Amino acid sequence: MSKLKNFDKKNFHSFFQKDILICISIIFLIFFFDRVSKIKIIDHQLKNNQIYINDFINFDLVWNTGIGFGLLSFETSLLYNIITIIIGCVIIFLIYLITKSRFIDKILFSTVVGGALGNFYDRLAYFAVPDFIDMHYKSFHWFTFNIADIFISIGILTLIVKDLFIKNEKN
């Protein structure tokens, strides 16, 4: 008897819907925590200055008109708008990949989309992304970033490491 005859369409749709529900939840939670953190830091910054935590990390609001970690900041609105459109297209493509990928990749793409949507929202609402996590050690100073950047980085780096590891396993 063929395994194809035992295929249960109802269970397939149920599993697929659970996958998508998990991905939507991840995207929403990351977007939510990113928004809340940015709203809190913007509100605090209007009343006070930076938040000193320790010698390694502070919260200090910086408005980023570029892409990740303040790279490629633009003065002209044309370049800013082009980058924003490209980011929107990348988000749409990542959502497509979520629907076509294996479960672990769906989760990782969802972390990237959740963070990207947080920053995309800011680009549309404020014409800049509020970055506020300021890390430094002695004279070394890292780029200022936000919660969305953390999830984008974790998702992308984990996808890269996973793909390298799996390719090495196959070879």
Predicted regions and their residues:
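Alpha-helical transmembrane bundles and membrane-interface segments of multipass inner-membrane proteins
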Residues: 1-171
